[in-house]
């Protein structure tokens, strides 16, 4: 537990993203898979999923995001939004997190007493 607390305390967000990384895509994928496997979950249901996007797929995610936000963010405020999206697009890749709702639903059915939680 102490090492986990130390890791959290030492964590810092890197706001300057870029494409220069020291790991290969395969190494990144392996490390992310290992982390996802070990992340605790309620009832150990392991419903968390991750999609890793690199290259053209990464670029497409941020282009779609930018064009979607352009439709809803007021024009006078869009420059700030665009700068933030462009900073994300400058990264080497994108990690998309989601929950597999089929796994969650199955767990709710197996444990109806706790389904609302």
Per-range role (PLM):
Residues 1-93:
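N-terminal amphipathic, basic helical "cap/leader" segment at the start of enzyme domains
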Residues 9, 93, 98-99, 115:
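Compositionally biased, intrinsically disordered low-complexity regions enriched in proline and serine
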Residues 24, 74, 99-100, 111:
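Serine/threonine-rich low-complexity intrinsically disordered regions
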Residues 36, 101, 105-117:
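Small-aliphatic-rich amphipathic alpha-helix that forms the alpha element of a beta-alpha
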Residues 55, 98-102:
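Beta-hairpin (beta-strand-turn-beta-strand) motif
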